[in-house]
Amino acid sequence: MPYRHSLRIRYDECDMQGIVFNAHYLAYCDDAFGVWVEAAMPGAMSFVGNAGSFDVVVKKAVVTWSGALRFRETVDIDCAVDRWGRSSFDVAFRGSVGGAERFAVLTTYVNVSPGTHTPAPVAAAVKSAFGAESR
């Protein structure tokens, strides 16, 4: 199921021209993914202080820019699973302002066993929560 996360660009995320630093685009996608996980599977994400049942690591992320994000803009980040594998999956992120696309990110996540970080098959419950069909 597609998910939308919106955020406003803050001053400290920009250079002197008011344009977002490149590294922040991946941080925005990471934030969108985390919020999506919490919305789709409350309490499932495993992290320090939370013994959840779901954990992933990033294997690859490809960013394509079609325009810059700027100070005080609100960016809408649409997230959808683009591919399901046995122990990995791709999430497509599309960032837009006022309907105009500014960037796209394709991230490959590897599902891992919480605590051991060894690759593990993606559970049916995870596929169901995020929409088992690919885009």
Where are each of the predicted segments found?
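Terminal targeting signals and extreme-terminal segments of soluble enzymes
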Residues: 1-76, 82-135
